[in-house]
Swiss-Prot record:
Matches recorded under PROSITE patterns: RIBOSOMAL_L19 (PS01015)
Single GO biological process annotation from the record: translation
Encoding gene, per UniProt annotation: rplS
Recorded GO CC terms: cytosolic large ribosomal subunit
Organism: Streptococcus pneumoniae serotype 4 (strain ATCC BAA-334 / TIGR4)
InterPro entries from the UniProt entry: Ribosomal_bL19, Ribosomal_bL19_CS, Ribosomal_bL19_sf, Translation_prot_SH3-like_sf
Name of the molecule in the record: Large ribosomal subunit protein bL19
Its job: This protein is located at the 30S-50S ribosomal subunit interface and may play a role in the structure and function of the aminoacyl-tRNA binding site.
Gene3D superfamilies attached to this UniProt entry: 2.30.30.790
Length: 115
């Protein structure tokens, strides 16, 4: 990477992010603007993918809400996310868990690792 770009992005990288991988269940505290108010919205689900590197790294979180699957993509280093909590660690053998989209109920469960 260009040293100039690298030096500019280094100051914007966050250091308060816990280590998590696909298969882990996370609770993301995202800032949402509604009109002139700003509030924190909690989005809890399974990390099904991590993409990119450096400042442009993203992760996808999937949850089931009222029987409908909902996925949100969050940039890791965004100031819009106040904090990320790892609720439980999952044991999976894939980096991308897109196959969970086709599974329902108990079939979509992920085995837990004790850490």
């Amino acid at each position: 990477m260009n040293p100039l770009i690298q030096s500019l992005t280094e100051g914007q990288l966050r250091t308060d992010i816990p280590s998590f991988r696909p298969g882990d269940t996370v609770r993301v505290h995202a800032k949402v603007v509604e009109g002139n108010r700003e509030r924190i919205q909690i989005f809890e689900g399974v990390v099904i993918a991590r993409k990119g590197a450096g400042i442009s790294e993203n992760y996808t979180v999937r949850k089931i809400s009222n029987g409908v699957g909902v996925e949100r993509i969050f940039p890791i280093h965004t100031p819009r996310v106040e904090k990320i909590e790892v609720v439980r660690y999952g044991k999976v053998r894939r980096a991308k868990l897109y196959y969970l989209r086709a599974l329902q109920g108990k079939a979509a469960r992920i085995k837990e690792i004790r850490r």
